[in-house]
């Protein structure tokens, strides 16, 4: 799930993910993990408990590809194949690079990429300070979970992790409306409609569309079956 202008509640509007990971245990306390995760983030204002957000009537989906490197710390000694050290809670942090491309569904049922449209005036002469956001960016992952050794070669890992991003455009919503009069000069008719879908009619230029003071976050929870192969651990992540 994601946290931002269209969703302010943890675990709400969650979607499945899939991925693969590689883990190198340095000792019983520390490990390095790299992972590749693919997921879809989604939110719709109609699911909000905030009446202003419901009236804003925006929604998006965003397919995320997340490549991460992390350092894990085990609170208890942990070693697969050693009956003395069969479970531990752990925490992790690291760095990720992710690719994203927010889309919205138009009235014809087609999903339209939002970044090229500059829905808040990005890349237009009137809003010189608003540049089009990058579709590949860095973020900071951190979280924790539990490791349980099933046998000498297999373990099960549950983890919850959240990503702190440095963009407010996971959902393509951040600042203000451009206004109908200005939009008519710069945008196609579809761009104008996707910029402002308010139920009570078009907003004025400068009206708040999102909260520019906060950045977006996204989060994963996963259950991993990890196995040893040639003294290395590899895993496959099903999730909810």
Where in the sequence are the language-model features?
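Repeated loop/turn-to-beta-strand initiation elements of outer-membrane beta-barrel proteins
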Residues: 29-32, 79, 152-156, 232-234
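Residues that define the transmembrane beta-barrel architecture of outer-membrane proteins
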Residues: 12-16, 63-67, 87, 136-140, ...
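Short glycine/proline- and aromatic-enriched beta-strand/turn motifs that initiate or cap beta-hairpins
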Residues: 1-23, 102, 216-222, 226-232
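Residues on the lipid-exposed face of transmembrane beta-strands in outer-membrane beta-barrel proteins
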Residues: 20-24, 67-75, 93-95, 142-148, ...
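Gram-negative (and chloroplast) outer-membrane scaffold detector with strong preference
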Residues: 30, 36-116
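Outer-membrane beta-barrel transmembrane domain signature
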Residues: 96-214
């Amino acid at each position: 799930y994601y946290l931002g202008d269209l969703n302010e509640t943890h675990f709400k509007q969650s979607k499945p993910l899939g991925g693969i990971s590689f883990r190198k245990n340095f000792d019983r306390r520390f490990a390095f993990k790299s992972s590749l995760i693919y997921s879809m983030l989604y939110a719709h204002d109609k699911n909000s408990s905030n009446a202003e957000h419901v009236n804003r009537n925006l929604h998006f989906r965003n397919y995320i590809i997340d490549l991460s490197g992390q350092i894990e710390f085990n609170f208890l000694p942990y070693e697969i194949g050693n009956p003395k050290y069969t479970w531990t809670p752990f925490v992790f942090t690291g760095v990720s690079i992710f690719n994203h491309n927010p889309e919205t569904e138009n009235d014809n049922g087609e999903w339209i990429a939002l970044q090229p449209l500059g829905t808040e005036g990005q890349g237009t002469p009137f809003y010189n300070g608003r540049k089009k956001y990058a579709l590949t960016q860095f973020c900071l992952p951190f979280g924790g979970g539990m490791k349980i050794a099933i046998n000498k070669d297999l373990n099960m890992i549950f983890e919850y992790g959240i990503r702190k991003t440095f963009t407010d455009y996971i959902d393509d919503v951040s600042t203000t409306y451009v206004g109908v009069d200005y939009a008519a000069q710069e945008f196609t008719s579809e761009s104008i409609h996707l910029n402002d879908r308010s139920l009570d009619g078009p907003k004025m230029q400068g009206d708040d569309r999102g909260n520019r003071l906060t950045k977006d976050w996204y989060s994963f929870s996963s259950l991993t079956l990890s196995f040893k192969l040639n003294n290395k651990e590899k895993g496959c992540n099903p999730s909810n």
